[in-house]
Design a protein with these regions (language model features):
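Cofactor-binding loop segments of dinucleotide-utilizing enzymes, especially the Rossmann-like FAD-
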Residues: 8, 39, 129-131, 167
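Short, glycine-/small-residue-rich phosphate/pyrophosphate-handling segment
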Residues: 96-97, 109-164
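N-terminal beta1-alpha1-beta2 submodule of the flavodoxin-like/Rossmannoid cofactor-binding fold
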Residues: 1-110, 114, 183-204
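Glycine-rich phosphate/pyrophosphate-binding loop and the adjoining helix
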Residues: 149-204
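Short aromatic-enriched loop/helix-cap "lid" or pocket-rim segments at secondary-structure transitions
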Residues: 47-50, 139-141, 174-179
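Short, catalytically relevant binding-site loops at active-site mouths
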Residues: 90-92, 134-135, 171
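Short, solvent-exposed amphipathic alpha-helices that sit
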Residues: 15-27, 143-157, 179
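Membrane-targeting and insertion segments and their boundary/processing signals
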Residues: 71-75, 129, 174-178
Length: 204
């Protein structure tokens, strides 16, 4: 069994990456081969609308034709048994790097033909891992649930199944006194990080 986790956060050792690492450790304990990819290490763009993936008889039909740092990863994803996408929430959505990755990952599959089935390598178990500074209640008030549903729907459409883990009210800094962030209670943030975040790691 092969599992790849995609870190859409610019931070390699913070909330999102930590949750992904725990998810991979769980997979490893079951005998899986695992890999963690940091998107911010790669040089790539989102979909460039070349439509080479839909060109009849084209050498890239059904696959993204762009040759950059993302190309080998997109090819490797075709071989996995499970795929985990992780991202912090910035302004109500996943990071720009994750969004660009999603465009490249998903758009290679559908074709514009009547009654055409979505092409995909095989059925793959997938999951989303989200981290965010807001509380669960505030996330609902701000309409995050729709974004969660839409993103899960994309993975279900193209890969077959999806689970989601939401980690709320995360710790942003080690030392809040160094930043212009007085609206937050650093003691409460630290307390939640020490008490709730380990439980989120177990759920991952």
């Amino acid at each position: 069994m092969k599992v790849i986790a995609i870190n859409g956060s610019p931070r390699k050792k913070w909330n999102t990456a930590t949750l992904l690492e725990h998810a991979l450790k769980g997979a490893e304990s079951a005998g899986a081969e695992t890999k963690l990819v940091h998107l911010y290490d790669l040089d790539y763009k989102g979909c460039i609308s070349c439509f080479a993936c839909k060109l009849k008889g084209g050498k890239s039909f059904g696959k993204c034709a762009v040759n950059d740092d993302l190309a080998p990863l997109l090819e490797e994803i075709r071989t996995v048994d499970a795929l985990i996408l992780g991202s912090p929430i910035y302004f109500g959505d996943v990071t720009g790097e994750m969004r660009s990755f999603m465009e490249r990952l998903f758009f290679q599959f559908p074709i514009y033909e009547p009654d055409a089935a979505v092409r995909q390598p095989k059925k793959v178990r997938t999951a989303w891992v989200y981290t965010m500074n807001v509380t669960e209640e505030l996330a609902r008030q701000m309409g995050y649930d729709r974004m969660f549903r839409d993103n899960a729907g994309l993975l279900e459409r193209f890969f077959g199944s999806c689970e989601s883990l939401m980690c709320y009210d995360t710790l942003q800094f080690d030392d809040y006194s160094k930043y212009a962030a007085r609206r937050f209670d650093p003691v409460a943030k630290r307390k939640r990080h020490e008490e709730a975040f380990p439980e989120d790691c177990k759920r991952a």
